[in-house]
């Protein structure tokens, strides 16, 4: 059994929906910490959950008011993705391979997250884009053809002898003239600009004013297609 298969089976047995093996050797050391590869772990949000959030007037604020965030599916799957990354980094290290988890706790503790700019040198969505899984939408989140933005991601950087997937070129933006996320944003932080490699995050979104209302995620037409395919309407 190859190491790729071993790791994928191990992660999927613990709840991962997909695993991608990505070459990051062409990126700067400042981004990669000198590691050659990244392992991307993905979890998908359920269609029923997304439909419930989409139909709610202000789901996130209500969950906070009722002190129910700890049982929210998105919150739980974000935690699970982080836990899987921490587990994988330990698993690889025990096998003698250098590995670094990019879980939220890890990047905070190691100073790889800049609190002032609310950024990290190598976001999960950047790795996902390099894997050919999707593009960066006008809401500054990954959009995938299959799930829209209804995903939770975490990554592990490593020098383990894995085989990385060959991607001809990252997907270009499929947002076109769509402005749904900008129109529905209650904080008016989405600027409506299509992302490309020369675009700064701040040119797309005012992250400092975003309250994470989640509306741009559930109302993205690509997320809606995923919901409709799986909810029978």
Please provide the spans of the model-predicted regions:
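Catalytic cores of enzyme domains
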Residues: 29, 70-187, 191-233
């Amino acid at each position: 059994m190859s190491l790729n298969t071993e790791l994928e089976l191990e992660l999927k047995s613990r709840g991962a929906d997909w695993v991608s093996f990505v070459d990051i050797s062409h990126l700067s050391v400042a981004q990669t910490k000198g590691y050659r590869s990244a392992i991307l772990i993905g979890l998908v949000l359920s269609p029923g959950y997304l439909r419930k959030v989409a139909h709610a007037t202000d789901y996130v604020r209500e969950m906070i008011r009722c002190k129910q965030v700890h049982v929210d599916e998105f919150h739980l799957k974000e935690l699970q993705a982080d836990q899987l990354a921490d587990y994988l980094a330990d698993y690889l290290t025990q096998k003698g391979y250098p590995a670094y988890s990019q879980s939220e706790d890890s990047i905070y503790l190691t100073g790889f997250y800049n609190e002032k700019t609310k950024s990290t040198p190598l976001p999960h969505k950047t790795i996902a884009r390099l894997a050919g899984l999707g593009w960066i939408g006008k809401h500054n989140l990954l959009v995938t053809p299959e799930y829209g933005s209804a995903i939770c991601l975490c990554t592990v950087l490593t020098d383990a002898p894995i085989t990385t997937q060959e991607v001809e070129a990252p997907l270009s933006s499929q947002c076109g003239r769509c402005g749904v996320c900008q129109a529905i944003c209650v904080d008016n932080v989405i600027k409506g600009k299509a992302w490309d490699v020369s675009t700064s995050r701040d040119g797309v979104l005012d992250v400092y004013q975003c309250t994470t209302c989640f509306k741009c995620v559930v109302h993205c037409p690509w997320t809606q297609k995923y919901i409709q395919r799986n909810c029978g309407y």
